[in-house]
Amino acid sequence: MALILASSSKIRSALLTAAGVTFAIQTAEVDETAIKEKWQAEKRDNSQLALTLAEAKAQAVADHYPDDLVLGCDSTVMTEEGALLSKPVSRQDAADHLRLLAGKSHILTSAVAIIEKGKTVFRHHDSATLTMRDFSDSFLSHYLDQEWPEIGYCVGGYRLEGLGIQLFEAIQGDHFTIMGLPLLPLLAYLRKASIVEA
């Protein structure tokens, strides 16, 4: 039985590789916008959305790999006002997201779900609170010059493993959760499932 990562995220792949996990990659084709719109129309708890998206991604790939473990992942960013942000689609969109978050705290939730033989056998989510500083327009322009288009793949428009760390004045939460993968609970499950050595 193989482990398949249903994500094209470079950072998630790098985190798993660094932890010694062997896996294949198969990108999930999921209409995230439709799921988010339905979620908001039903006024469901935004803190659970990342878990729903992670399961949807895992299921989309598991349909094609019924004999393997499929790992789906997702992260969401929710503003203090309860608005959900999506991945920025343009440099201007990224600038707008970052200006919206500047000087405030937001909640980043990362989730994982594993599907085996059509059933969810593991699911976990964790949240972190990140507080952005008030930054200047010149810093924002410099940041976008350095980080766009790579941050277009990041729901908050930032990557803490690079220049994005300078956007923040405070961070509360697990490092791996902030990177997009609640790694320690995931590794505990993978050991239990004999995917990695115990």
UniProtKB/Swiss-Prot annotation:
Similarity field: Belongs to the Maf family.
Active site per UniProt: D74
One GO molecular-function entry: nucleoside triphosphate diphosphatase activity
Pfam families attached to this UniProt entry: Maf
Annotated TM spans: none
Principal subcellular localization: cytoplasm
The reaction(s) this protein catalyses: a ribonucleoside 5'-triphosphate + H2O = a ribonucleoside 5'-phosphate + diphosphate + H(+); a 2'-deoxyribonucleoside 5'-triphosphate + H2O = a 2'-deoxyribonucleoside 5'-phosphate + diphosphate + H(+)
Gene Ontology CC: cytoplasm
Cofactor: a divalent metal cation
Subcellular location(s) of the protein: Cytoplasm
Assigned keywords, A-Z: Cytoplasm, Hydrolase, Nucleotide metabolism
Protein name: Nucleoside triphosphate pyrophosphatase
Biological process annotations from GO: nucleotide metabolic process
Signal peptide, first to last residue: none
InterPro entries: ITPase-like_fam (IPR029001), Maf-like (IPR003697)
Domain of life: Bacteria
Function: Nucleoside triphosphate pyrophosphatase. May have a dual role in cell division arrest and in preventing the incorporation of modified nucleotides into cellular nucleic acids.
